Amino acid sequence: MADPSFSYTLHYPPVDGSLLFPEIIAFNAEHNSNVPFFVFPEDGSANGVVSISHLEFYRACHRVAHALRPNRAGPDGEIIAIIAMTDTIQYFALLVGVIIAGYIPFPMSPRNSAAAVSNLLLKTSCHRLITTQHSLQPLLDGIKSELGSFNFSFQDVPCLAHIYPKLGLETIDDPFEPFPARPSRPSASEVMMYLHSSGSTGFPKAIPQTHQTVIHWCAAAPVVDTKLYPADTCLGVMLLPSFHTLGIICSLYLPLITLRSVSVYAPTSYNDPKAIPVIPTSENILEGVQRTNCNALMAVPAFIELWALSPSAIEILKSLRFLASSGGPLSEKVGNALASVGVPLVNVYGGTECGGLNSMFRRKDEVCDWVWINLSPRVMFRWVPQGEGLYECQILQSEMHRVSVENLPDVKGYATSDIFLKHPTKEGLWKLVGRKDDIIVLSSGEKTVPAPMENTIASNPVVGGTVMFGRARNHVGILIEPRQGFDVNIDDPKQVAAFRNRIWPEVEEANKAAAAFSRIFKEMILITRPDKPLPRTGKGTVMRKAAVTIYDKEIDALYDTVEASTTVNKDVELPKDWSEESLVVWLGEHAARVNSDKKVDPEVDVFEQGFDSLTATFLRNRIIGSLSSSTDSNVRTTARQIDQNIVFSNPTIKRLSQALARVVSNPQFTGKEGSLINRKVELENTLAMYSEGLPGTLSPQVEQPNGDGHSCHVVLLTGSTGGLGSYLLASLLENEQVSLVYAFNRSSKDGKSSEERQKAGFEDRGLDIALLSSPKLRYIEGDAAQDKLGLGDATYDKLRTSINVIIHNAWRLDFSLSLSSFGSNIKGTRNLVDLALSSPNAPSLRFLFTSSISSAQGWDKSKGACPEEVLFDANVASGGSGYGASKYVCERILEKSGLQASSFRIGQISGGQPRGAWSVTDWFPMLVKSSLALGALPVAKGVVSWLPPHAVSQAILDVAFAKAKPPPVINLVHPRPVQWAALMQSIGDALVHNNLLTKPLPIVAFEEWFSRLEQKAIGASADDFKEMPALKLLPFMRMIAQSDKSIRKVTSDGEAGGFVVFSTTKAQQLSRTMRELAPITAEDVALWMKYWASKGMFM
């Protein structure tokens, strides 16, 4: 629909070569001064939209030139690299401003590795880099290290407020000083700027762009044909990186030449130069489309496929004049579905080496041909037959279109290696079907090279042939033809499973050498039929494309099955009836199957018998699969009612059988309520049981001094070998006020001594191992849940009479378990309290408990931040995890003990100095690893108050040794939180910087990310859990996703993921560490990533 408010007279700049690129900028400033160039949404502005005119953009570019080269000092032609995270309107003013200054810009991806960037700089003799040092410091440090003695300098990007002083309000009457003009006009053959290739097969390559090349690209079909749409067309380019060829063509050349405006995100750095630009999500892109009345959009397949799942998103897409897809193959199934309901899809094709090659203009009656590319008649193509009706596309140099890279042996031109299929009836239409080198391009844009993996798998003697597939899918699969004599009846599930198991060692070997997104899941092995062998050439080589074609239906069915079903388990027969007694036996057999065939005691918590989150999830899947195989339709219906947490809520086989019996008899019951014990009542009963007989107060005695600087403290530290425990031990051993430390730990199942484990813990975290030789250190092994802590009388009595500080840090870390699974931990806490009460030092003894913020996640957020007080309403913990409930119980036990006790509600502990150590089994590292397999990073609205372990340990000691009596509760969360979005941007940068990815992952809303994860949970295998460990925490991730969806409707920022905000007033009063703690930075993130990589997390 046309915009009636659009009333500009347009004077199109010529693209015949009479004007060069900088002159086109000036032409528009003079002849199209008020025509909108960029538009972005802004509350409070006219119509809610701000427009940057061609005049204002022109002047912004000149202000950049002044800032970079005052008075045009020095010689022309210096190459200036640009690696910056800036707002779009700032980036392009910078890019053009460098040209106007007489320099040659070289925009680079900030997601390149330091080695890749350094190689580009050296190859082009570039000695100067304009950047955003505040957001890219790890990368810049790496570049410095790589360049060594190479003469090089960094310069910050001119701030947005300087180059756009009126930001949307500038007129021709406002003061302005143009940058001094160049003495002579550049020749068309001069290099105007550099771009670089993607680097998918090695380091990115610098690709020069001459003035003539740029003008040819400005006159190319993707740009000029957009003038065929009405003059009020506004193209959404929010998703396009400003350094990328497509971003430059669509966000810069197109509005300059066609005078069609482009919609971008509102700038964030006008008032805060260090603010991170808006991170694209599928949600905020469509929001920008609506708020700026945008009627055309550029997007990548991953986002389009997400929008295809949302009816409301489809309605928005249907209203566009065109939706252009680029950056990877869009699934034809998705594209056809969208086109069938009226979404005006267009495929965009081109490259940095050759520019844009097809028109984005399509008539409405051509929508059904969306997958076919209408190549530009301005470009001279050569089609080289590849057999099977396929052709390689080559672009030949011509007077109307120049390529930037020449690689043909006979004529000037560029061989793309892209393989096309000619439309059977419509002249000029071509379909991109793959690459000459058979690279598989996934829907995320990631590329899988199949040959090495196929060859590895084919080395198994039972394998006769292999062909990988997965183009436009989110993961790959493989066709395997059994060698003659090893035929498989593919209709027999047992034979199929046996064959997969037989070849699995070679598949695992292939997976080890592959990128995360290229790994093959066991369920994605498709075995060929004997009556449909793989097609081969005369030489015996498998014809890859023909093979995928003849198995097209089976491949589609396989993806549908893997993504939508739970594996049926028939190795355990269904019970004869659904009574609790029969179910105890039946569930016991299933439990043994997932527990290495070890018999499980039905009366004992399964998590005390070796189960973890993974085995619990497998047990649930087996239950669902078995129920699904029943001949009783009511039982099959029951399979869909099983709650995700049924095993965690019912952690003994007996309780699980009770819950399952109720589900079968009443499908409305899901098992979510476990045995229907009210959680609050269970929590209060547990508290009553373990606090029985506590004095409440102690008789006053002469207290021993605290905090006087003398070596007077004898400390009992539990759980010293773990993460926080190691930092606590190091801090204690370094502290001059401590005379003796008892490091109390349970004996190890693997037979390693406490000394060995402690040394390993210090080494892993980079702590000073020399401290472990301190004469102040004593190791004790015992079990706090046992009488007298599992110690002999003499050792127990020595502890009782000597210690005056207890730091209780040992605890089971599993957020999936119910309260009853933490009974031994709670009992151990009570035993330690009894130890303290029996001590002659009891009145002055300090008992410090490392609790958790999860003990108060039920706090009423409407009351503000959770205070540093004992919370007597058990509801604050009854609705959360068993882990948090158990910590709450112990906070209350300590409150009733009469001791000088403090419970530290500790928030998320991140990695810390000196190595960035952060356990790869913690939820956030698991999220990061899973994101690689899912092809996206999640963003949540709000802040994170994570803090490093050395800060936690020191804050605890600050309180432990203070002169004043400690308060009963202290909240330890970061007093200066950071935005989740900024943190995730740093994660993305660090993944690329550490060469874990060749290009950045898209960042999507947490809800979308979780949707991908949840789909993977259906029928998840052991390999799925290895690739996506976040599957183990599905309920936790679901909670964050649901909370984030609600939070996005609120304007103010709280804690990301819907977590409670905690007051730190007392913590900062009592601890200098907390008062002076610096926020998390990109440097911290870089340390985490380096540590995770060193632990093999990404292998």
Swiss-Prot record:
SUPFAM superfamilies: Acetyl-CoA synthetase-like, NAD(P)-binding Rossmann-fold domains. It comes from the Eukaryota. InterPro entries: ACP-like_sf (IPR036736), Adenylate-forming_Reductase (IPR051414), AMP-binding_CS (IPR020845), AMP-dep_synth/lig_dom (IPR000873), ANL_N_sf (IPR042099), Far_NAD-bd (IPR013120), NAD(P)-bd_dom_sf (IPR036291), PKS_PP-bd (IPR020806). Its EC number is 1.2.1.-. Residues 29-360 are annotated as: Adenylation (A) domain. Pfam families: AMP-binding, AMP-binding_C_3, NAD_binding_4. Adenylate-forming reductase, a natural product biosynthesis enzyme that resembles non-ribosomal peptide synthetases, yet serves to modify one substrate, rather than to condense two or more building blocks. The A-domain preferentially accepts benzoic acid as substrate. The natural product of the enzyme is not yet known. Belongs to the adenylate-forming reductase family. This is Adenylate-forming reductase Nps11. It comes from Serpula lacrymans var. lacrymans (strain S7.9) (Dry rot fungus). The lineage of its organism: Eukaryota, Fungi, Dikarya, Basidiomycota, Agaricomycotina.
